[in-house]
């Protein structure tokens, strides 16, 4: 035991034994993320976050449990709530996250896997899905985030030249009339795909997953491509491979704005 692990659950410490822990800084987002060199013979990841409503790991744990056997996602190895913190130990998927330089070097291959991966996520049957993260819920959460001052006003000012309250008001005024509901990843960007060679290994960071408008993912995917490559040169290819005709640009802008609160 050392200073960083002294408050961890005893059961977790016993499970980990003397294995090597390394802080992980890309993918598997969370307050504290560790790469576990070996857990019962295989590598794993440990996520730790406060149990407060806007940072709890509970939604991700529920998503991973529901997706087990439906999509390639990490298997849950251990969970706990202890001392005001959530703990999630899960298997490590083989490969590298989509932002890794060796993956990004093969741009067209990445875009292909990126689009096909999203198509597989959105192809899940949602009729009995217990996870909901649609627009009304997102707006309620955004309102609470604004009211509790959980978003940096400077970031909103820099990007949109307004206050968080004004941006939230704009979202209410311009809310899309309809939702095209699918199972959505919720934070579909390059670091949240794991790619092994030339194949998609799986999806990570599913804390925002649930039934939502497909544009929740499409919008962030387009933004991620723009961020990675500096422009929209791969946007048309991504949409073609995903299988979308007639992009709703207003919805793209809307969901990118909404994501400022998350």
Swiss-Prot record:
Residue numbers annotated as active site: 187 (proton acceptor)
Reaction(s) catalysed (UniProt annotation): kanamycin A + ATP = kanamycin 3'-phosphate + ADP + H(+)
Subcellular location per the Swiss-Prot or TrEMBL entry: Cytoplasm
CC terms in the record's Gene Ontology section: cytoplasm
One BP term from GO: response to antibiotic
Assigned EC number: 2.7.1.95
Signal peptide: none
Pfam families: APH
Function comment: Resistance to butirosin and structurally-related aminoglycosides, including kanamycin and amikacin.
Oligomeric form and interacting partners: Monomer.
Protein name: Aminoglycoside 3'-phosphotransferase
């Amino acid at each position: 035991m050392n200073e960083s692990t002294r408050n961890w659950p005893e059961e977790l410490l016993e499970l980990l034994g003397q294995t090597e822990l390394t802080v992980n800084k890309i993918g598997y987002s969370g307050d504290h993320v560790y790469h576990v060199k070996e857990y019962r013979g295989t590598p794993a990841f440990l996520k730790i976050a406060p149990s407060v409503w806007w940072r709890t790991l509970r939604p991700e744990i529920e998503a991973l449990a529901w997706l087990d056997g439906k999509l390639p996602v990490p298997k849950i190895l251990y969970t706990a709530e202890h001392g005001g913190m959530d703990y999630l130990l899960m298997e490590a998927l083989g490969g590298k996250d989509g932002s890794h330089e060796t993956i990004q070097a093969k741009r067209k291959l990445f875009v292909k896997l990126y689009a096909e991966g999203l198509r597989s996520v959105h192809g899940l049957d949602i009729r009995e899905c217990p996870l909901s993260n649609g627009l009304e819920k997102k707006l309620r959460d955004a309102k609470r985030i604004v009211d509790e001052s959980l978003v940096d006003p400077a970031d909103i000012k820099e990007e949109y030249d307004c206050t968080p309250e004004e941006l939230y008001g704009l979202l209410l005024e311009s809310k899309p009339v309809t939702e095209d509901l699918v199972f959505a990843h919720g934070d579909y960007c390059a670091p949240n795909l794991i790619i092994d060679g030339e194949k998609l290994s799986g999806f990570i960071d599913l804390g925002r997953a649930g039934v939502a408008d497909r544009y929740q993912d499409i919008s962030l995917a387009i933004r991620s491509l723009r961020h990675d490559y500096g422009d929209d040169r791969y946007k048309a290819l991504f949409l073609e491979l995903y299988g979308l005709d007639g992009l709703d640009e207003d919805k793209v802008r809307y969901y990118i704005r909404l994501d400022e609160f998350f």
